């Protein structure tokens, strides 16, 4: 559901099916330059909710700002990057998101869990059922990094 929360600022509720969080809010700032903040999981339902909002708002070009690296906020970024959106994030967030997009991060995490006492039969290689892993971004993205003190000019 798309709601105007302030002049030229809209909130789209994005479903997170079968997840205790149930949903996240994605924001759109409209003006001469448009910005979408966060994307939801890498799931069809999230993508459809965002496509619906973009269509309803009548925008064709927009950038995407990622608030943080959790996959419920950045899962779809490679799809938006491929469609021509500029993807903005802090450098640490962007580097970690790209690191998580491959298998090395998840193998290292599995190994740490085992090292610190989680029985492999109960957890270990089963981290693939965790939604943070299951619905994460799957491809590296060329980020535009933002830093503390940077001013982003969107809306109008």
Predicted segments — roles?
Residues 2-57:
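Conserved beta-strand hairpin/beta-sheet module of binuclear metal-dependent hydrolase folds
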Residues 11, 28, 147-156:
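Core dinuclear metal-dependent hydrolase active-site scaffold
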Residues 45, 52-150:
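Active-site HxH/HxHxD metal-binding segment of metal-dependent hydrolases
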